[in-house]
Design a protein with these regions (language model features):
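Beta-strand/loop-dominated core regions that host nucleotide or nucleotide-derived cofactor-binding catalytic loops
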Residues: 2-27, 35-92
Length: 92
């Protein structure tokens, strides 16, 4: 069930590829434990848990997505900032 949208404005990848921080604007309530769908390239995407949500201002938030539990993969993308939108779900 989709509960929010998140519009990406900045991306902060981790060099060891264990997590990515996304900063942007939220429409709807986003909480720790929800999931977001991340598209790694045109044909490969994955659903990952949101492990932390930091409120920066009104509807500005920073999401910490954790890949520690996911299978090994290589982050092969950097999003089109301002054009990427995530659907946030309350279940996987």
């Amino acid at each position: 069930m989709k509960v929010a949208l998140f519009f990406v404005e900045k991306v902060f990848p981790d060099e060891q590829e264990k997590f990515i921080l996304f900063e942007g604007t939220a429409e709807g309530k986003i909480e720790t434990g929800m999931f977001c769908r991340i598209q790694l390239n045109r044909s490969l995407g994955m659903t990952v848990p949101i492990s932390n949500v930091a409120r920066l201002s009104n509807n500005k938030v920073r999401l910490h997505t954790d890949f520690e539990e996911q299978e090994d993969f290589e982050i092969v993308f950097l999003m089109n900032i301002g054009e990427e939108t995530f659907e946030i779900h309350d279940s996987e």
